[in-house]
């Protein structure tokens, strides 16, 4: 869709990114999967690692089709982007550029908000969703577009044989109902972790949160130590010396 709307065939993606295994999505990723196919890349792809890379690419390319990026890189190692990246992309959008946010991994509460774009305060032109939309019970994906893109699309013909499968739609609807019913979006437990060897601690925002975690772990057979009066929001993880790998795996 982005290629069709822009009329250009140059894509930009982030370092270590992964966006899928179809021809276009694989080629718009920083992965070696496309090397297994003896198929000519249908578009030119440029990759950036940091803000300086992205600035250079945006200045040097006047015929970019789109930028595709994950709010937090998933399969490529789980790391976030600097705030400068999002500032640059906002400027790119202001000049008519299209930014696609791949929320296949980060969507539906993985970052503490319903979607990653809320966490990073960024409004993409297109959002890719999957996995969490059905809580993993059925294969399902979705592509959301903003009003600017919607006005440019006369007819959307990029369908697949099983697009809109009723079982997938039912699973997605029930998942969304449960998220709303349990108010999962607002049940956040934000903790700061510290670790030195096998010694670890998690600092929660309130003593109530830490005690809730300790109580639940004890129900599961694990004894965690809560903090003293000065650190009442902390949960300490101090495992004993393991006699073998199996005990270690069980504790994990």
Residue ranges and their predicted role:
Residues 1-252:
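Conserved N-terminal phosphate-binding loop of PLP-dependent enzymes in the Aspartate aminotransferase
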């Amino acid at each position: 869709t982005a290629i069709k709307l822009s009329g250009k065939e140059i894509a930009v993606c982030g370092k270590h990114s992964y966006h899928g295994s179809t021809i276009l999505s694989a080629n718009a990723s920083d992965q070696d999967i496309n090397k297994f196919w003896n198929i000519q890349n249908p578009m030119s792809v440029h990759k950036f690692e940091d803000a300086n890379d992205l600035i250079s690419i945006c200045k040097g390319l006047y015929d970019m089709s789109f930028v595709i990026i994950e709010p937090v890189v998933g399969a490529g190692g789980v790391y976030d982007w600097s705030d400068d990246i999002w500032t640059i992309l906002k400027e790119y959008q202001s000049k008519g550029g299209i930014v696609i946010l791949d929320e296949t991994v980060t969507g539906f509460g993985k970052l503490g908000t319903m979607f990653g774009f809320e966490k990073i305060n960024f409004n993409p032109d297109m959002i890719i969703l999957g996995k969490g939309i059905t809580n993993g019970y059925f294969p399902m994906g979705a592509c959301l577009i903003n009003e600017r893109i919607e006005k440019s699309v006369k007819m959307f013909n990029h369908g697949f044989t099983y697009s809109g499968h009723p079982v997938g739609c039912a699973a997605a609807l029930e998942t969304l109902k449960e998220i709303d019913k349990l108010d999962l979006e607002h049940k956040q437990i934000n903790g700061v972790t510290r670790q030195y060897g096998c010694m670890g601690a998690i600092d929660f925002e309130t003593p109530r949160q830490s005690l809730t975690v300790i109580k639940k772990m004890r129900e599961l057979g694990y004894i965690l130590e809560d903090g003293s009066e000065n650190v009442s929001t902390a949960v300490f993880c101090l495992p004993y010396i393991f006699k073998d790998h199996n005990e270690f795996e069980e504790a994990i």
